[in-house]
Each structure stands twice: as C-alpha cells, then as structure tokens.
Amino acid sequence: MCMRDLRGKRVLVTGAGSGIGRATALAFSRQGAHMVLCDLDAASLDPVRDAIASAGGSCSTHGVDVRDEAAVQRLADSVHEEGGALDVLVNNAGMGYLGAFLDSPVDSWRRTLDTNVMGVVHGLRSFLPMMHAAGGFRRVVNVASLAGIAPAPNMSAYAASKSAVIGLSDSVSLELRLCESQVGMTVICPGIIDTAITRNTRNVAPGISGEQLARLQAFYAAKGARAEIVADAIVGAVKSGRELVLVGPFAKPLYHLRRISRTLLRKVMLIDARRMGFD
C-alpha cells in the first residue's frame, strides 16, 4: 500500500513545532500536501506555518497535549468535520529522558510513557477508525527510536516507551491486515539524531552530572544526523509503503548486530556508555 502522489493529501503531524516533527511537516508540504500541525507549545507552530505559507503551501495549527485523550479527540472531531479522514497520520510527538533507573523518579516514567506511548495510542484511537472506514490507501507513521531495539544505559524509561511503540505498531498493523484494511502502518526508528530533545535539561535525572550531559550532547552534535534526514525517510516510507524504516547513524548496523548477537550488542553499548563517562 503506497501513496506515490501526495498532492492534496491531508497529513497530520504531532509534535510539529520542532525537530523531526517540524522537518516532517515541511517535507510533506513541499510534496503538495495540506498539513494539519499540532504541538504542546502552540506558539512553536507559528514559524512552521509561516514557512509553509511562504512556500505556497497550506496548513492549520493546533495547540494539543497528546497525553490528553479528550484534547486529541477534539482535534480529530475538528479535522474530520473540516475535511473528512486523514490520508496520513504521523505520530511524532515525544520526549526523551536521561537517567539511571534507580535515580529516575516515578513521575519521570509517567511523563515519558504518557507522552511517547499513550500519545500514540490516543492518536490511533482518534484518527484510525475514520481512516479505515473511508477506504482508499492511507498510512499511519509512528516515530519510535533505535533505542527501542538497541537500548543504551541510562535510557530505561525512553527505551521502554519506544519499544512499546514498535510492538504497538506491529500488532495494530497485523490487525489492519486481518480486516483487509487499506490503511498501512510504518514505524520509523531513528538512530542518533541531533535535535532539541537531547538538550532539554528538564528531562534529566538528578544523578546525571553536568559533565556527563555535556559529553552526551557533544556526541549527538558531532555524530547525529539532521532531522531532515528522518523527515525525508518518513515521506519516502509513505510513498513506498515500507513498514520498518531505520534511519540515521548506527541504526542499521546496530539493528543487524542485535539480530546476530545480543551479547555482542550489549558489549558495544557498554563501551559507548563508558566513553561518555557513564560508569
């Protein structure tokens, strides 16, 4: 199930105010899609809207917290009333959390899981039924992470949330096939990407030192790919119908290493962690 021509398609991107979400919104707009953008920080959408408008595109913007089921449903009701079912839903909104498991407060787990997992669940429950009922080729893209496949130390909450997104995507994809739906499902697993998610010090456990955080941020800045690389991969997956997309530095090698030897993968992850002072 692929969608070669995106002109006039209605595409919703969550977390569109920055990073991968912003780049994805601009990438789809360049393909001629009508964009529906939402973000917890409504003001962050203004420059994205302006960039799309200045390039001759069209979009609507909405301040929405994806953790709030009722708010996501209100957005869906508005979107459906305005133009019917979406053609593409990109569940991108997410947050990172850095910290050893024993140093991470339970509240940090709740925030991470509510945003990264329940945010996707709310998006699916609010938009997928109409997409399925409308018929025609449509697609859901869930943005997970390489961390859901090859977890690193001090990322237990984030890794667990992204692993859940991968499992959720796989299971729902099979259900869609069982009912012969024309809605396809793609899960995107970015590797090292240099975005603001790594620079948000609010999402860092008390046990992480300033030096450790600085080393990690320097590593992401030096080795991380640009968000636009992920955005192009998302657009490409919608056009080709790919179900799993690994993108960015280290994503494919670590994915295949995990399949070959989990023991060797763990050794590699420990070596990298020690290089950044996490020991």
Sequence positions of predicted segments:
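Residue(s) in the substrate-gating loop at a strand-loop-helix junction
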Residues: 145
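Substrate-binding pocket helix/loop in short-chain dehydrogenase/reductase
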Residues: 100-101, 105-110
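SDR active-site lid
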Residues: 177-245, 249
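Conserved glycine-rich cofactor-binding loop
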Residues: 10, 17-18
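Active-site helix of classical SDR
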Residues: 124, 161
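The beta1-alpha1 cofactor-binding region of Rossmann-like NAD(H)/NADP(H)-dependent oxidoreductases
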Residues: 42-43, 63-74, 106
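Conserved glycine-rich Rossmann-like NAD(P)H-binding loop of the short-chain dehydrogenase/reductase
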Residues: 33-47
